Amino acid sequence: MPIVNVKLLEGRSDEQLKNLVSEVTDAVEKTTGANRQAIHVVIEEMKPNHYGVAGVRKSDQ
């Protein structure tokens, strides 16, 4: 049972998230041969002030 965790900054539309789940599922199915029904995709959206790169929060850029 593949479980794929995707972390990204919030702000995508519901349609974009729907497509992300579908495309990730397709890729895992194709590359691993896993049964599509067993593939789980978990999306975690982060607030820009909860994520930083090189010591700077995304909300401060």
Curated annotation (Swiss-Prot):
Pfam family, one: Tautomerase
Top-level class of the enzyme under EC nomenclature: isomerase
Record EC number: 5.3.2.-
InterPro entries membership: 4-OT, 4-OT-like_dom, Tautomerase/MIF_sf
The entry's keywords: Isomerase
UniProt GO molecular function: isomerase activity
Active site residues per record: P2 (proton acceptor)
Gene3D superfamilies in UniProt: Macrophage Migration Inhibitory Factor
PANTHER family per the UniProt record, alphabetical: 2-HYDROXYMUCONATE TAUTOMERASE, TAUTOMERASE-RELATED
Protein family: Belongs to the 4-oxalocrotonate tautomerase family.
Official protein name in the record: Probable tautomerase SAR1376
Organism: Staphylococcus aureus (strain MRSA252)
